[in-house]
């Protein structure tokens, strides 16, 4: 978890998270200027742990959000990590974070009001 102050990760206290990725061809790509803008705006939310970037995602990016903070795109599948019986319950923190945001306990808008940066 790169950014915890989001509507999607505010309840994620553990790091790293163990969440399965179930893709073989998908990977994140953006040019260097876009990446720099996204990093500066806190839009890179998740990165693969060291040695876990099996698909060549640029900058080890596993999840991003748009500049308004209300859209989250990610490669891992948190819905497949909700019960220890299946290997991990680490995905629950993502769903708990969204619940907190919907209930009004966390803002959906980034600190800059979503005014700066590139669209993702």
Task: Enumerate the language-model features and the residues they cover.
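Amide-donor transfer/coupling interface in amidating biosynthetic enzymes
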Residues: 1-120
